[in-house]
């Protein structure tokens, strides 16, 4: 994997609050190598380590994107839902931003069936096939379609398991990380001071609670994916 320069700026990270961790009583001792100080009862993340692992993650996704690999971005915090969707769409990635259903990847055959039903319902609605049905049936189908859109809309074009999964909140998306580990899917995860850095293939030490921090990290990764996609298009 070739190392590249991703313009990861220390001042920019400080302004975004990437370095702010949790209170010292909530920490995970496994994060000790990634913590540089304690300030007013709060752990401070070592931004030199953040820079290193964010750079490694950017290199990984760039190389994968340049080979035409697929990505899934997972972030189901309510405040981050729109950010996850817009970033994923920009980089042509799949995404889950509402709720992670247990077995979404490990029971892929079931997920694939639901996605097929979802696509069929969308096609029928677009072709106005619902108009020939009784009103009660139309209402039921529209409710079902709305639910499928809400929870599966971000993966509606996913026809196989993703090659790399990016997770924005390790603790909230623990089940997603475990499913990836079972299936051997490489993962990249933000790791706040209360997290376990061993749960992902690349853990980026960073504040996973503040929107400015999440946005900065996600934007760097998405930029690297877009650059890799451009190279793939040029070579094919």
Swiss-Prot record:
Question: Could you tell me which Gene3D superfamilies the record lists for this protein?
Answer: Glucose-6-phosphate isomerase like protein, domain 1, Helix hairpin bin
Question: Which biological process, per GO, is one annotated for this protein?
Answer: translation
**Keywords of this entry:** Chloroplast, Plastid, Ribonucleoprotein, Ribosomal protein
By its UniProt entry, which InterPro entries does this protein fall under? Answer: Ribosomal_uS2 (IPR001865), Ribosomal_uS2_bac/mit/plastid (IPR005706), Ribosomal_uS2_CS (IPR018130), Ribosomal_uS2_flav_dom_sf (IPR023591)
Its localization reads: Plastid, Chloroplast
GO MF terms here are: structural constituent of ribosome
Q: Which Pfam families match?
A: Ribosomal_S2
Please give the superkingdom of this protein's source: Eukaryota
PANTHER family (alphabetical)? 30S RIBOSOMAL PROTEIN S2 PROKARYOTIC AND ORGANELLAR, SMALL RIBOSOMAL SUBUNIT PROTEIN US2M
Q: State the similarity comment.
A: Belongs to the universal ribosomal protein uS2 family.
Q: Mind telling me what this protein is named?
A: Small ribosomal subunit protein uS2c
Gene transcribed to yield this protein: rps2
């Amino acid at each position: 994997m070739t190392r590249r320069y991703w313009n990861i700026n220390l001042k920019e990270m400080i302004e975004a609050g990437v370095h702010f961790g949790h209170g010292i009583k909530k920490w995970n001792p496994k994060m000790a190598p990634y913590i540089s100080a304690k300030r007013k009862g709060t752990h401070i993340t070592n931004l030199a380590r953040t820079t290193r692992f964010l750079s490694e993650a950017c290199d990984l996704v760039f190389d994968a994107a340049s080979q035409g690999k697929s990505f899934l971005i997972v972030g189901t915090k309510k405040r981050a839902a729109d950010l996850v969707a817009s970033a994923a769409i920009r980089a042509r990635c799949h995404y889950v931003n509402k709720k992670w259903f247990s077995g979404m990847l490990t029971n892929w055959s079931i997920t694939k069936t639901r996605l097929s039903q979802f696509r069929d319902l969308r096609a029928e609605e677009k072709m106005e096939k619902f108009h020939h049905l009784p009103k009660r049936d139309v209402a039921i189908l529209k409710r079902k379609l709305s639910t499928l859109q809400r929870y599966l809309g971000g993966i509606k074009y996913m026809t196989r398991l993703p090659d790399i999964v990016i997770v924005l909140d390790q603790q909230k998306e623990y089940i997603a990380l475990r499913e990836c580990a079972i299936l051997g899917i490489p993962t990249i995860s933000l790791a706040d001071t209360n997290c376990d850095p061993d749960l992902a293939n690349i853990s980026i030490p960073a504040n996973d609670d503040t929107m400015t921090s999440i946005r900065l990290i996600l934007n760097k990764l998405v930029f690297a994916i877009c650059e890799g996609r451009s190279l793939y298009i040029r070579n094919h």
